[in-house]
Amino acid sequence: MNTTDATDARTSWDGVYAARPAATDPRPNVRLTETVADLPPGDALDLGCGEGGDTLWLARQGWRVTAVDLSAVAVERLTGLARSHGLGDRVTAEQHDLGASFPEGPEGPEGPEGPEGPRDSKNPRDPQGPKDPQELKGPLGRVGAFDLVTAHYLHTAFPLDRAAVLRRAAHALRPGGLLLVVDHGSTAPWSWNQDPEVHHPSPREVAEAIALDPAAWTVERADALRRRATGPDGSTAEVTDHVLLIRRTA
């Protein structure tokens, strides 16, 4: 995304959020709650957080959450909401154009102990706790910062190399961590994109586009699921979610 595109995108999304009342307790996405409810909390990254329904839910479950959005309005609102709900110590909201920058995570770009040291060997996702830093660093030569990265409906009308963003998100995981990508699999009546020719890539197509090394990442789920959704005006419709769940194994 070039400078003009990025400015236009920020202005557009700021306008979207500014035009509607601020949410006081936004709801989390159902695909997040059903996937994450039984996981032990750790460090999470919420890409395209909006006003923060997923972020706040994760924080209430004990996760430390880095929440990212292109819109300064959304980031400011989420920061205020987290504080008002007593979750300010668990939520860090940051403005990013994901085509140009990416959050480093709670311990910086090289993980909890920098480029030379392993993370906590008592991580419940990795009970054996690899002692060799080279084993922990994996194929990128760096330690991931997150146990969970979520990207719900990360669609935009502006130029964005989404596959590159999701690839970077997968690399930001610690070994054992999960990348949850939920996309629109159908066009809702209230969608901003009513193009009848629009293609909704399947979860497998998304996985192929991300092009991760199967020696280090495993697709655990690739489903198309139906649900009843409610639009901004209160109307309801049957929609399809495309759900992709990838685990980093090395």
Predicted regions and their residues:
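Conserved beta-strand signature within the Rossmann-like core of class I S-adenosyl-L-methionine
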Residues: G176-H184
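Conserved SAM-binding strand-loop segment of SAM-dependent methyltransferases
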Residues: L87-A100
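Conserved SAM-binding motif I beta-strand of class I
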Residues: R64-D69
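A short, conserved alpha-helix within the catalytic core of class I
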Residues: T156-A169
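Conserved SAM/SAH-binding beta-strand->alpha-helix loop
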Residues: S71-V73
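A short acidic, Gly/Pro-enriched loop at the edge of an enzyme's catalytic core
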Residues: E104-G108, P139-L148
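Conserved class I S-adenosyl-L-methionine
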Residues: M1-L39, G42-G50, T187
